[in-house]
Amino acid sequence: MKELVLFANLQLFSADVNPINVTTQDSMSPTMKTFYDTALLENAREQMVFTQFGMKQPMHGNKVEWRKFNTFEKALTPLTEGVIPTGKTFGMTKIEATTTQHGDFVAVSDRLELESYDDVIFGATEEMGATEGETYDTLTRNILVAGNSVAYAGEKTSRDALTNTDILTPDMVNKAQTWLKKNKAPKINGSYVAIIHPSVAYDLRNSDEWKEYHKYNDVAPIFKGEIGELHGVRFVESNEAKIWKDGDTCVYATLFLGKDAFGVLDPEGEGMEMIVKTREQAGGPLNQFSTIGYKFCHGAKILYQERLLRVESGSSYGSLDEAN
């Protein structure tokens, strides 16, 4: 019944809201505002697969800033009695990213609120929260897939050379984690992490090595979206893992990460805002609609190129998926 009502009144979600100056008092109580803010943030947080692994910092002005400390060389030269060694100079590098602002809203008519059996405002808030989280995470992903370090499946040397048969294999996973180890990338809770598309995960989970490992190892998930582990890498699934498409061939990016490979503006600080306008505030002279929207600032930056490896591959689903 709910779907029929919503379908019949689909036009009542129209975003053609005419701007009008309305003088009102805020009729939403602080308790209700907190309720809707919490609902939006919880739904947004569930969609943030990439963002969960970033070094989070608050915003300062229109920028977000991270500091990474310089490493030291080994002290292999023996000390000389009575001679003070030269020592090292401690330093750090400041990395900045300019933030961008994003947002959207939906208008809900008074008739839809009256005719629906459900809490339309809360339902719209949940959907807006999910969309906000997906948007935030996609912005983060777009920065990460532009990293300098890339490897290609199937012994190929470029994205253009990849085909749908060049799937991600256990051997490629082993090579990726070896690359991170050789670059001394610290682990995240004892493991490296790979963010993988479900289509690529399907091929990997069909491999004998994956099946054999999980036959004898019960791996408890510790990350949002985690589906399993192989060669010391915990795999986290996301529909937003990057896909490029050319004709019937899709190329998928699987991101292998070490700790603090990138930084991101903390979405739970100044990053996100839920905005609900009641009919009295936004509905014009006849209080005909309310609005539900979100607004956030986003900023992200790769901090350590040597802790982030993008592995591009095909998938047996390559002819069916679309670019994202």
Enumerate the predicted regions with their spans:
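Hydrophobic alpha-helical segments involved in membrane association or supramolecular assembly
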Residues: 66, 126, 190, 194, ...
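Structured loops at beta-to-helix junctions and adjacent beta-edge loops in soluble globular domains
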Residues: 67-70, 109, 197-199, 238, ...
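N-terminal "assembly arms/tails" that initiate or stabilize quaternary assembly
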Residues: 2-98
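Alpha-helical scaffold segments that mediate packing/assembly in large oligomeric complexes
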Residues: 111-183, 310, 317-324
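Short acidic, glycine/tyrosine-flanked loop/strand segments centered on an H-E-D-like triad
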Residues: 89-116
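Short, low-complexity, charged/polar segments at coil/turn and helix-coil boundaries
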Residues: 38-75, 167-217
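Sequence/fold signature of self-assembling virion shell proteins
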Residues: 12-47, 161-175, 206-324
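Short, solvent-exposed loop/turn segments at the edges of secondary structure
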Residues: 61, 99-101, 189, 287
